[in-house]
Each structure stands twice: as C-alpha cells, then as structure tokens.
Amino acid sequence: MEDINRIKMVLFEKNKTARWLAGEMGVTPSTVSKWCTNSSQPDLATILKIADLLEVDIRELFVREYKQYLLSQEKK
C-alpha cells in the first residue's frame, strides 16, 4: 500500500511519539499506529488537529518533500 500520509515521519521530525499523539488526541495508541502505517486514515478534522498539535502546515502531513515543494512554489 502506498503511503497516503506522513504522520509517522513528521512525528519523528518533531521528536514526538505515537503514544504522545494518542494522549493529545484522546485516541488509543493502536489508532495512531494505524495512521502511522497508513493502514487507516484519519478524517480531515483529525488531520487538522494533528497538524495543529505538531505545529506544521497541514500539507506537510501529505507532501513527501514539503520543503522542496515550498521552494518550488517560491520560484513560480
């Protein structure tokens, strides 16, 4: 299965754990694990809350090379 979201990678980049995110979101660690492995996807409202908690733009949770994406947009 192709990765749809980058939650696992962004958690790593922010030095946060899936257990931390589960606690902040009020869901089980198993639920966050499913999001991190892309075996299930959170709904849009949940994605927005995750982005807020991790202090990232929502696009960073989906675009693989977000920083490169931003640079390419600045050149346009």
Which residues are covered by each model-predicted region?
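A short, Lys/Arg-rich alpha-helix, primarily the initiator
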Residues: 1-17
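Short alpha-helical "recognition helix" segments of helix-turn-helix
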Residues: 21-22
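Recognition helix of helix-turn-helix/homeodomain-like DNA-binding domains
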Residues: 26-41
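DNA major-groove recognition helix of helix-turn-helix/homeodomain DNA-binding modules
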Residues: 45-60
